[in-house]
Regions:
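Acyl-donor (CoA/ACP) binding surface of acyl/acetyltransferases
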Residues: 1-27, 57-156
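Short loop/turn motifs at secondary-structure junctions and domain boundaries
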Residues: 49-54
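Conserved GNAT-fold acetyl-CoA-binding loop/helix
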Residues: 27-47
């Protein structure tokens, strides 16, 4: 098991500026949709009353420093959870995306969800490699995204 280096929690107002710093980095965010917004727009999206069925963004915080290292997007679709993840470029390649994704998968299992899905642009190789490492398999392509699925409940 990985050491627990971060905690996943709802966003608070202090997270908005560090969130903007990487979300508005056009090169780093080339594969992402939620980017390039104003502080007010991010605050409205991140600090509102989000729900799993509407989709919610959560902060990934380094437990040692309290620093925002990235974020997760979760959306419930019946008994499936859609997962999105972003790590700040300052923290990329250190296993944070793997750790947070594993934590979400464990939580989804405990909640009784049947599968986790993620959509990835075909040339986003780091993300595809992460999903493969987690045991996801590519099920289909929709628009310009490959849809990866991980079935998390073993059949009885």
């Amino acid at each position: 098991a990985l050491p627990i280096c971060c905690v996943i929690r709802p966003f608070n107002a202090d997270d908005i500026e560090p969130f903007m710093a990487y979300r508005n980095d056009a090169e780093w965010m080339q594969y992402q949709g939620f980017k390039g917004l104003t502080k007010e727009a991010y605050a409205e999206a991140l600090l509102g009353n989000a729900s799993l069925t509407q989709g919610m963004q959560l902060a990934a915080i380094d437990t040692a420093t309290g620093t925002l290292i990235g974020d997760l997007y979760l959306k419930q679709e019946n008994d499936i959870i859609w997962l999105g993840y972003t790590v700040s470029p300052r923290y990329a390649g250190q296993g944070y995306a793997l750790e947070t994704a594993m934590a979400v998968i464990d939580w989804c299992k405990q909640q009784g969800f049947l599968a986790v899905k993620a959509g990835v642009v075909a040339d986003n190789l780091p993300s595809i490699n992460l999903l493969n490492k987690l045991g996801f398999s590519c099920s289909c392509t929709e628009d310009d995204e490959q849809i990866f699925v991980l079935n998390i409940q073993s059949a009885h």
